[in-house]
Amino acid sequence: MRIGIGIDVHQFSEDRKLIVGGVEVPSPVGLLGHSDADVLLHAISDALLGAAALGDIGKHFPDTSPDYKDADSMELLKHVGKLLEQEGYKPVNIDTMLLLEKPKIAPYIEQMRRNIASCLDMDMNDVSVKATTNEKLGYVGRQEGACAHAVCLIEKK
């Protein structure tokens, strides 16, 4: 068994949709990035890639490549799952933490868990998504951006 950790940060932008965990969350601002800027799925992708010693999301999906402009991070996560499978690994458990002040995402967490589990052919009960504020501290507290952390456990098939 191997453990991976991932973190991702994106700043808010008024001309973007807020996509988190593959769910479009109603919000006056979205996250800025080369792809759809799904901060949660990016952190998970990094955790999985790291656990398998396959590098990071930037290595596999560089933001300098037009191929990934506005890319759907659900598709990127599916690709990460295939890379793990090619190396003989499967995800066992994923635990995540999303930090943002607004909007509240509690109504969307179950769909996010379903999306993540579906992308990686996992049981939804093995995927955890949690959210908290930053108590108005730092860039998250000032609502300048959002951050996500992910920890995963993978094992050889």
UniProtKB/Swiss-Prot annotation:
Give binding positions for a divalent metal cation. Answer: D8, H10, H42
Q: How does it assemble?
A: Homotrimer.
UniProt key word Metal-binding: yes
Role this protein plays: Involved in the biosynthesis of isopentenyl diphosphate (IPP) and dimethylallyl diphosphate (DMAPP), two major building blocks of isoprenoid compounds. Catalyzes the conversion of 4-diphosphocytidyl-2-C-methyl-D-erythritol 2-phosphate (CDP-ME2P) to 2-C-methyl-D-erythritol 2,4-cyclodiphosphate (ME-CPP) with a corresponding release of cytidine 5-monophosphate (CMP).
Co-factor binding comment? Binds 1 divalent metal cation per subunit.
Do you know which CDD domains this protein is assigned to? Answer: MECDP_synthase
What is the protein named? 2-C-methyl-D-erythritol 2,4-cyclodiphosphate synthase
Output the GO biological process annotations, alphabetical, semicolon-separated.
isopentenyl diphosphate biosynthetic process, methylerythritol 4-phosphate pathway; terpenoid biosynthetic process
Q: In which pathway does it act?
A: Isoprenoid biosynthesis; isopentenyl diphosphate biosynthesis via DXP pathway; isopentenyl diphosphate from 1-deoxy-D-xylulose 5-phosphate: step 4/6
Q: Which organism is it from?
A: Chlorobaculum parvum (strain DSM 263 / NCIMB 8327) (Chlorobium vibrioforme subsp. thiosulfatophilum)
Q: Which family does it belong to?
A: Belongs to the IspF family.
What residues bind 4-CDP-2-C-methyl-D-erythritol 2-phosphate, as annotated?
A: D8, V9, H10, H34, S35, D56, I57, G58, T132, T133, N134, E135, R142
| Site description Transition state stabilizer, residues in chain | H34, T133
